[in-house]
């Protein structure tokens, strides 16, 4: 009697809602988690066996083509993918695609062929052979051995034939060196030691626990969570994931890991090359990469035994992915820790209100570090009211900040000027006709970058040379930049503080990790007097002689209708101000503002974080916004305004009735046209006890939209553009 064919469900990294069934030939062996190649229409694609079906199918099924020898996805990883997909209202296949984004990782790493001694003596020994064997102290290529020994390649070939040497293969992806948790740590203060002891105990429990590590800038949060990492590494199979919000911060923190654990961690971020990603992915899957430091996408690596997750700077909005699959890495990190039954530490000097609320509700343990170690003190913060003391026409630095810069330079100390606008000018207009230059097919202003002589759309990446004449009216020489960017600020600084060594730190001026390391080294050694930067300067860089921080336009983040505008402004300015003063040098921050009475600005200057948090929570509670409710966004786009408006009407009419849910819209998105597509938005608010994800998914299922219309669901949106 013929054996019953095995049926496997294969999830594909495609925008598909569920796995497809395939027949597994008797010649192949695969189980849940195995990577396989299958046919999808005319194409051959790679997927993952999601389950094995006990009942045969009545349909003729395509066979699995092949089984790939890469380490499979664990049951925990598959569960995480399914639960994450449900939470963020995305097809499971698209979440799987994030776990498979390094396609080359599924291939066996390339190998090199080397020669080594066997220990046997050749029957005939010559001086040349003797020389070659004497040099063969470690594996190397035959050509390298011949060169090193000063003999011909034929001598090496003869030793191989005689059995005195043999070929061995070595992977070009070597294992990562093992970290040593027993290396001596920095001396901790009493407060730090008490906090680290609690975290160590939490890790030892080997179950899901979450802690908020809430410490002022410079309080030693990194040193404290290092001890939790050391505790996790006592288990020789344990792995640790440290998430960081920026590639820049990944580079800055690597040396600190080396100092504590003797080796650099494995790094995972978009700047890594394909071979580096292959190496990290496979070593993580095999359980040999013990500490992984990475950006948000590292969350989707296939860890074999994840025992601790750390989300550093957990408040940072760059943890929210705003294109492709929309998710917040902090929220999914908590979900992954729950699935893996491991500890998670959320660290920040300015925690998000959502995380603080969870700590207040007892879901997370709240651990606080109140002081900087040693004699270091927090910087003094002063407000410069620009309504009272405005800068001169055409300038952006007011008299109070200018005087402080002069004092700082005279004391041979460093200043940091913060302006969160890239480029030279955020807007280019024609003086003749008033036209504002926009990106093609997009409601987004073009930003002037004078260093490159180009106009850039920071939303779509469109770039063009600055035209000599206005494209609208043809007037020559009429285009002018309006408002300051970091390049324009640098121009003013060069003019006003002659002789000062000035550099800009932004994503435009730092093209690579090496560029960033070089700039940071110059700052650390005092080769820069004034550093001008965007928000990248707020993240984790400590400069010993930086004593002055100047915020050029504190009000920029308060403009617009973003519900988190005040929170984000407070967090960012507190982080930036915290760069000033370390060791025995007291720091100060001067914040230029036209709205000193704004709660975010006034309470920042007063140093009263708790009062600001209470104020923001009160405002959110009144309207049921996060953390007291949940938000979702539905974004529709289509080639024409008529198409998107028709789709919005269809969606409105198909809205399910549900208690505890409010729907606002449709309304034109603030960026009404993006890449030639017209956009409309709905905003959905739900009570905390309502399953918002299920509501959004059900709403999407109820309405069949035309193929020209795209619908995007965003759970807990951070951008309302």
Question: Where are each of the predicted segments found?
Answer:
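Accessory, non-ATPase domains that flank or precede helicase/AAA+ motor cores in DNA-metabolism machines
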Residues: 1-348, 355, 360-376, 409-410, ...
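Flexible beta-alpha connector loops of hexameric P-loop NTPases
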Residues: 71, 265-274, 316-327, 387-395, ...
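Accessory helical-bundle/CTD segments and flexible terminal tails appended to RecA-like ATPase motors
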Residues: 101-120, 382, 387, 434-436, ...
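Walker B catalytic acidic pair
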Residues: 295-296, 312-314, 421, 534, ...
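Conserved P-loop NTPase nucleotide-binding/switch module
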Residues: 303-332, 336-338, 349-350, 431, ...
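Conserved interdomain linker/interface between the two RecA-like ATPase lobes of SF2 helicase motors
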Residues: 335-347, 352-431
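Cys/His-rich short segments
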Residues: 401, 407-496
